[in-house]
Amino acid sequence: ASGTILSYIMTKAMNRNLLKVIFTPPENTAEDAEKSVRAIHQGTARDAAFLMENAAKVIIVPGYGMAAAGAQHELANMAKILKIKYQVDVKFAIHPVAGRMPGHMNVLLAEADVNPDDVFELKDINQEFQTADVAYVIGANDTTNPLAKTKTDSPIYQMPILEVEQAKKVLFVKRSLAPGYAGIDNPLFYADNTIMLLGDAKDVTKQIVADLE
């Protein structure tokens, strides 16, 4: 039921028909062939720590992957260290349909004692990605997918996204390169300014925290 409610909210935001979104299978034959020959830039926790400790502004983008891994406390700790030890401007960017229910990310961040003044909704934060040194994307797949702006046959076409690709560097934490809820590939994985941090979101973030400390 929660998935259907989420789909309804997404389709309202996209001004699209719910049944069409649910029952239209993603087209991926040519896409899969192209994906198989594309390379990613894979990094380590130390790479991520180095980039963030030397940044002026970091925007953290949590998604369902953070919730599934239970990584909110590690994420809050990472943000705290960056702010206090390295004087980095750290903000959290929340997509309205991130997670499995409205407000899912806000609840988890509040549970981890993240300052609500550091948490911003899509409409209030999107313009800041272009001045961010690092976007730390933790399990937020469809809500950051640039295909929402260009691929007319995509189930997420016209859904507003968080413009993370505008950051100087994108650190994308994900267990694998598998598609998200919408079932489509994310070209961000293969972008020149993206470093993939493959693994469990909680473990990866914990390793970064250890390096930052």
Regions found by a protein language model. Give the residues of each.
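Membrane-interfacial segments at transmembrane helix termini in multi-pass membrane proteins
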Residues: 1-55
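Structured cytosolic domains appended to multi-pass membrane proteins
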Residues: 36-213
